[in-house]
Amino acid sequence: MKNPMLRIALHEIRQILREPRFLLPFLFPPVLLILSQMTLLSAEMPPEILSRMMLFCALLISPMTVPLASDSFAGERERSSLELLLLLPVRPSAIFYGKLLALLPVPLVLVVLSETAYAFFSGCFLFSLWWKSVFAGFLACFCFSGISLFVSLSVKTARAANQISLVFVFILMIAFAALSDFYFRISWAPFLLALFVFALFSAVSAVSFRKFRNG
């Protein structure tokens, strides 16, 4: 593969998949939610409750991009390997966007798998609820990844990056929950939310890259 950005992204993804401490937070929330569905809740739920539970399942996974993003740059700086990374014979943009690209595949795949599993075990698969929940999970992953990456570039340790990023995650989780009724009720709401999230993600990514390039 000749594209350096894709090579860096694939290397980062392989590192993520080799690290159980990064994978376990992605796996536990949907498993626990599905088990609670099977043991505590009734098999048949009204669509209103099911939509909230499926959205909750997606939102439990998406913040797990925070430790990945925190380790991307703050972790590299803490291990004194960021300077070595910048000495690679590739453009800074390839390093930055390769690392950014590597943050998304694992959580996005797990959002789809967990939402599908939850819908299956709930005994009430409604495609309209499924795709909207998956889409909300995707948007939350992009949102949390962009903000966490910016924080990771602004602090010196991965722990500090995690702690600061979780404040933003808490605020955004409240916003997603508050808008859930509007999101599921209005047909064009997902597309409006997508425009906002991708505009935010693009702006934060551009500012983060400038910060990375300027050191």
Predicted regions: what they are:
Residues 138-170:
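A structural motif at transmembrane helix-loop-helix junctions in multipass membrane proteins
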Residues 90-120:
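Selective transmembrane-helix segments that form parts of the transport pathway or gating/packing helices
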Residues 178-194:
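Extracellular/periplasmic helix-loop-helix junctions in multi-pass membrane proteins
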Residues 40-51, 114-138, 142, 185:
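Membrane-interfacial helix-loop-helix connectors in multipass membrane proteins
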Residues 154, 198-215:
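Junction motif at the cytosolic side of a transmembrane helix
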